[in-house]
């Protein structure tokens, strides 16, 4: 009796190897085993330890896939052992396609491995179907954490235990990585995996940063009350149209010196650079603006008054002729004065028949008005007009004395 059963078992194993429907590396295999009719009532079903000691792994069996609709996944292998005792004699090809269950792959957990290994050693009275289902729509659905799902009905009124294995493309990490490019979308929430919201930073992405009001907003509202006379040069320029700014022309450089110009440039260069980087609420911006603006118009004016003794020596243009101690603040005035010592008169009158020459251009302009009769300076109190501004000033003094 035992020899006959062993021979029959060897035949069943060879038939099972020929009908095993799985390629190496494919994740989904449906196997249904049925009881042999002649051996359903045999009391010696589980008394073969030599057969149970050698489990057959599904990934070691190679065959041709029975269906074209099976999903091909090269990232998952099934390593659960299958109980190949003699009561599971043959595998029907109809059972492989009898009950396809569309289920969602669950997140991987340690309980799935232990449950699958324990299900392989169940009694022979309940046949087992090991499936791994992966669908294209599983990436957009909510994943369920339950590793074992038992169907209520099966073929011939028998229950089938479905062991669900996780599929890598539908894992929550891949779902989040696929949606990282769409920052405004919320990723799929998996019940068994906590979701950590992190800030994704990219060079071209501005929406991820928190926009807070800059110092420019607080400067235009509250800084005028806190510093009414100490506004920065850039703010006073936009409000008062250069009324409070020091003159930085060539004439003012000669009069007030290059130190005031360097201070004004230092105010414009140093002041806005840390201001544009400060972010916070409006009150902090106002306090910070008051603390980081040491240079103001009043401070530059005070420095200009206090620097007069030493700095004016650099701005003074002194005549170097013997016996002449005249001093000018402009180099053009000194050149015109030097012509009085040298006798040079480069400006000639172009009026026909006039041979007058002048050392200064303004003297030539005044002389030329005598020929033309132009009198641009008019008195506001009377109808008289003058060709020279100093003549008009003397005339207006007479009106004031009368």
UniProtKB/Swiss-Prot annotation:
Subcellular location: Nucleus
InterPro entries on file: Znf_C2H2_sf, Znf_C2H2_type
Gene Ontology biological-process entries: negative regulation of transcription by RNA polymerase II; positive regulation of transcription by RNA polymerase II; regulation of DNA-templated transcription
Broad class of where this protein is predominantly found: nucleus
Keyword terms of this UniProt record: DNA-binding, Metal-binding, Methylation, Nucleus, Phosphoprotein, Repeat, Repressor, Transcription, Transcription regulation, Zinc, Zinc-finger
Pfam hit, one: zf-C2H2
Motif (9aaTAD): 80-88
Modification sites for N6-methylated lysine: 313
Classification via SUPFAM superfamilies: beta-beta-alpha zinc fingers (SSF57667)
UniProt GO molecular function: DNA binding; DNA-binding transcription factor activity; DNA-binding transcription repressor activity, RNA polymerase II-specific; RNA polymerase II cis-regulatory region sequence-specific DNA binding; RNA polymerase II transcription regulatory region sequence-specific DNA binding; zinc ion binding
Segments for region (Disordered): 81-144, 219-254
Sites bearing Phosphoserine, chain numbering: 202
Low complexity: compositionally biased ranges: 89-144
SMART domains for this protein: ZnF_C2H2
A cellular component annotation (GO) from this entry: cytosol
Domain of life, source organism: Eukaryota
Zinc finger annotations (C2H2-type) as residue ranges: 317-341, 347-371, 377-399
Family stated for the protein in its record: Belongs to the Sp1 C2H2-type zinc-finger protein family.
Function of the protein: Confers strong transcriptional repression to the AP-2-alpha gene. Binds to a regulatory element (A32) in the AP-2-alpha gene promoter.
Protein's name in the database: Krueppel-like factor 12
Highest classification ranks of the organism: Eukaryota, Metazoa, Chordata, Craniata, Vertebrata
Name of the gene: Klf12
